[in-house]
Amino acid sequence: MSTAIEVTPSDLENKTFLDSNELVLNMGPQHPSTHGVLRVILKLDGERVLGTECVIGYLHRGVEKIAENRTYVQFNPYVDRMDYVAAVSNGLGYCEAVEKLIDVQAPPRAQFLRVILTELNRLASHMVWLGTHALDIGALTPLFYTFRDREEVLKIFEKYCGARLTTHAFRIGGCIYEAYEGFEKDVLDYCDKLGPRIDEYEGLLTGNRIWLQRTKGIGILNAADCKALGVTGPVLRAAGVKWDLRKAQPYAAYDQVDFDVPTGENGDTFDRYMVRMQEMRQSIRILRQAVEKLPAGPTMAKVPKVLKPPVGRIYHSIEAPKGELGYFIVSDGSLQPYRVRVRPPSFVNLQALDKMVRGALIADVVAVIGTLDIVLGEVDR
């Protein structure tokens, strides 16, 4: 008896037989190009992506539940551990949300210090994105340049508050640390250096034939889909939507500085790259103005040592490097929040991955994940 399977010409026309070309492939959770412990289940037909499913939660630490068992002040350092690449932005969003809840406003000097530190952090975050995104696609050199320049931002943070990554730079009511001697000079010197270096980054990538082939027309997400999925940040602006919370709903001292909101046209990987490159230039522009306008005065408002906000609820959001970062806080009048709900941009933007890679090649999945600029500490919380 023969055990061989005979295939007839009619079998080749049978749909069920052709379906055997479909393959389910697990990408991650231990994969260098998922930028964390993300598992992506890919359904493939050859090298074409038919669909994806993201499996998250490998880095879940229960941050929102921890908030219910800490005082408002005690929970402040925890938010730095979500998007640990942009810890300063996390702290700013949380502190401003609690300040709204207790009806306290940070002094003008603190507002400008917050803008300076947050924009430095935006630059550092975008440089991590650029270096790793380029590396994913096969360009090694930009990684060394971007991490070299990011190091100078981390040194400024270290001199300001003693920490480099999870800075805990802000407090409810303002900034606990005064600017160190030479702070303004360090920031302006860095701005002078970084402008030409951004031109160097673009010289390596923007006109590169391989870079263009790997990014142009890849991972398209149009404006309508962005709005339907709740996507924000550079991903939304790359689709042509001019929405930036620093302009639309100004906070801190952003209403006192002038800057543009870069947008794209096609909503593809290349446009998302270009939007972030232009954002870095705008951050330099904001930093120069903020240093020039930095007023004298106290950096902390008068805030009770024991915070006991009145019964109520508040939602406050800021423009983090990756998009809209929001905090919904419910107070029951006790020392601890009744509920803290975080709206992390990485979590929301990741939902768009399936829409962006359907019909693309498997090699393009890595490029699209990189251009979303997700951090799994923020996705999983």
From Swiss-Prot:
Keyword Translocase: yes
Keywords for this protein: Cell inner membrane, Cell membrane, Membrane, NAD, Quinone, Translocase, Transport, Ubiquinone
Keyword Cell cycle assigned: no
Positions of disulphide bridges: none
Cellular component, GO, one term: plasma membrane
PROSITE patterns: COMPLEX1_49K
Membrane topology value: Peripheral membrane protein
EC identifiers of the protein: 7.1.1.-
Known function: NDH-1 shuttles electrons from NADH, via FMN and iron-sulfur (Fe-S) centers, to quinones in the respiratory chain. The immediate electron acceptor for the enzyme in this species is believed to be ubiquinone. Couples the redox reaction to proton translocation (for every two electrons transferred, four hydrogen ions are translocated across the cytoplasmic membrane), and thus conserves the redox energy in a proton gradient.
NCBIfam families assigned to the protein according to its UniProt record, in alphabetical order: PRK06075.1 (NF004739)
PANTHER family, A to Z: NADH DEHYDROGENASE [UBIQUINONE] IRON-SULFUR PROTEIN 2, MITOCHONDRIAL, NADH-UBIQUINONE OXIDOREDUCTASE 49 KDA SUBUNIT
HAMAP family: NDH1_NuoD (MF_01358)
Similarity-based family: Belongs to the complex I 49 kDa subunit family.
Name this protein carries in UniProt: NADH-quinone oxidoreductase subunit D 1
Species of provenance: Koribacter versatilis (strain Ellin345)
